[in-house]
Amino acid sequence: MPGMLTPVQMEALRNARGAEFDRLFLTGMIQHHGGALVMVKELFESPGAGQEADIFDFVTDVDSGQRAEIRIMQNMLKEKQ
């Protein structure tokens, strides 16, 4: 699934503390949210997919929400560096 953290990334997160944990967590969540955007893009590129009104509304909300949260987390990450 796009955006999933690898076992190595999860282990690093598990072992991290303090600012290093914050950095790894935010980086991982940005990656994870990016995976949702990949899935949204793939859905809309699939012929006939996402045409139902409820699905279209849901996926559009996911797209805008994930993009907004990525921007927030990117700003948080910049503040931590």
Regions found by a protein language model. Give the residues of each.
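All-alpha RGS (Regulator of G-protein Signaling) helical domain and cognate RGS-like helical scaffolds
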Residues: M1-Q81
